[in-house]
UniProtKB/Swiss-Prot annotation:
Coiled coil: none
Keyword 4Fe-4S included in the entry's annotation: no
Disulfide bonds: 56-68, 57-66, 62-69
Protein name, as recorded: Conotoxin mr3f
InterPro entries tied to this protein: Conotoxin
Amino acid sequence: MLKMGVVLFIVLVLFPLATLQLDADKPVERYAENKQLLNPDERRGIILHALGQRVCCPFGGCHELCLCCDG
């Protein structure tokens, strides 16, 4: 009886969990492929924004990805 319980647990719990984990990886790969099409400046801005770091904007070009620095 114990062997049948172990087999049922593996088939009904562990096998579906393994297949769901593989399905969850696909959207992340698709998102990464889309981000590779960005130019290097956009990619740098996204990475710095995600890290919470901001750089000085070029002269007269202030926007949300950088700080307006004096100088």
